[in-house]
């Protein structure tokens, strides 16, 4: 019988072992030895937990220049992401990509709904004239969904501010022929042009009003802050927002045909933050040309290209200017590419190989498809830097997320 070792030497013994338990990620994902692995083809060995869960940060790069607080996005499918899902994905620290299975105008309209849900400084507020009737003001409430409007001397933006009208001013007025100037709040509290967003929010807290109107030195209306946006900030402090406008971040998908160029123009005009080039095979001359055109036409727009499953595919898209990659072929909830075309790659191997390559160029990746159970997240995240793009998994949880 072997001698019993001193328990104090247990750690020293592990250091002298020829190799640690299990396989390294490089050994596990060696395609020459193991071919391709799906998520349920392996398990992750446990290790030492020497930190509290509160110390864990899920902050992850979506693209070269966009960072979110959670590594979750919703897929650009017509059964998954429209304006409501995109709004709540952004509020809950992720991002949603609005599908393009609709007219360009309808897609741009969905985009505007997301963008208008929350604002920083509202630089193009809807204003009315002092000679507008109460009846017309009530109609504007029904049209826009709110009843608070700045009143300027000529009813135009960037004109002399003469008052403000709210729902309280007109709620009990029965004579709809009265003019706004007869019922409006005169001399509303204002902020001076140049105040910061945080300074403006502090004023809103003190005055306990629905809006803060910002004017220049001549008293002309410049912009506006809304109390409802302040309340949204308190409820969703980590919401995904544009660094410039403080509006919610959102993305959208387009195809790679010439007709998609005009669609993209409409989306950019509506405030697009990041675009997905939606294709099951991203390594095509059509997508490469589209990436180059976008970079020339809209150099500040972030592009997520794909889908890819190999390093060679990734290399072409990175060289063309992609700011992020989407990984997966035949692994989505309704995708049948592998069965019909005998083309694709098991998602575990695809994710590791593409991420390992793309990370060398600072290009983040997202795994698209293959999530069947909650533990699939852990498989996706080992040794890699990327997001999870969910489609069918989200559909059954839609009301839980958005309600």
Swiss-Prot record:
Gene3D superfamilies: Aldolase class I. SUPFAM superfamilies: CBS-domain pair, Inosine monophosphate dehydrogenase (IMPDH). Keywords: CBS domain, Cytoplasm, GMP biosynthesis, Metal-binding, NAD, Oxidoreductase, Potassium, Purine biosynthesis, Repeat. GO terms for biological process: GMP biosynthetic process. Pathway: Purine metabolism; XMP biosynthesis via de novo pathway; XMP from IMP: step 1/1. NAD(+) binds at residues 278-280, 328-330. K(+) binds at residues 330, 332, 335. It is found in: Cytoplasm. The keyword RNA-binding does not apply. IMP binds at residues 333, 368-370. The keyword Repeat applies. GO terms for cellular component: cytoplasm. Residues 121-183, 184-240 form the CBS domain. Belongs to the IMPDH/GMPR family. Homotetramer. This is Putative inosine-5'-monophosphate dehydrogenase 1.
């Amino acid at each position: 019988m072997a001698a019993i070792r001193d328990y104090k030497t247990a750690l020293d013994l592990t250091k002298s072992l020829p190799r640690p338990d299990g396989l390294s990620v490089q050994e596990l994902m060696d395609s020459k030895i193991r071919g391709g692995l799906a998520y349920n083809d392996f398990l992750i060995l446990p290790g030492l937990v020497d930190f509290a869960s509160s110390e864990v940060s899920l902050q992850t790069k979506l693209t070269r220049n966009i960072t979110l607080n959670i590594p979750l996005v919703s897929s650009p499918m017509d059964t998954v992401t429209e304006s409501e899902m995109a709004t709540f994905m952004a509020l809950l620290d992720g991002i949603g990509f609005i599908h393009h299975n609709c007219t360009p105008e309808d897609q741009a309209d969905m985009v505007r709904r997301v963008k208008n849900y929350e604002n920083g400084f509202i630089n193009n507020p809807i204003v009315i004239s002092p000679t507008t009737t109460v009846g017309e003001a009530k109609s504007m409430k029904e049209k826009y969904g709110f009843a608070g409007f700045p009143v300027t001397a000529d009813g135009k933006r960037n004109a002399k501010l003469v008052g403000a009208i709210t729902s309280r001013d007109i709620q009990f007025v029965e004579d709809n022929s009265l003019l706004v100037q007869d019922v409006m709040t005169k001399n509303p509290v204002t902020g001076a042009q140049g105040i910061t967003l945080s300074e403006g929010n502090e004023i809103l807290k003190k005055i306990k009003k629905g809006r803060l109107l910002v004017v220049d030195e001549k008293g002309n209306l410049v912009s506006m802050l809304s109390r409802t946006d302040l309340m949204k900030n308190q409820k969703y402090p980590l919401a995904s927002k544009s660094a410039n406008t403080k509006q919610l971040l959102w993305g959208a998908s387009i195809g790679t045909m010439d007709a998609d160029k005009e669609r993209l123009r409409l989306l950019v005009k509506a405030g697009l933050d990041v675009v997905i080039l939606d294709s099951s095979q991203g390594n095509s001359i059509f997508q490469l040309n589209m990436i180059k055109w976008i970079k020339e036409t809209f150099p500040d727009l972030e592009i997520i290209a794909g889908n890819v499953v190999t390093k060679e595919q990734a290399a072409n898209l990175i060289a063309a200017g992609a700011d992020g990659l989407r990984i997966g072929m035949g692994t989505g909830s309704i995708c049948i590419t592998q069965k019909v075309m005998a083309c694709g790659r098991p998602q575990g191997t695809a994710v590791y190989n593409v991420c390992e390559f793309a990370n060398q160029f600072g290009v983040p990746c997202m795994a698209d498809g293959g999530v069947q159970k909650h533990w699939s997240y852990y498989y996706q995240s080992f040794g890699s830097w990327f997001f999870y793009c969910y489609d069918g998994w989200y559909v059954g949880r839609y009301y839980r997320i958005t309600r």
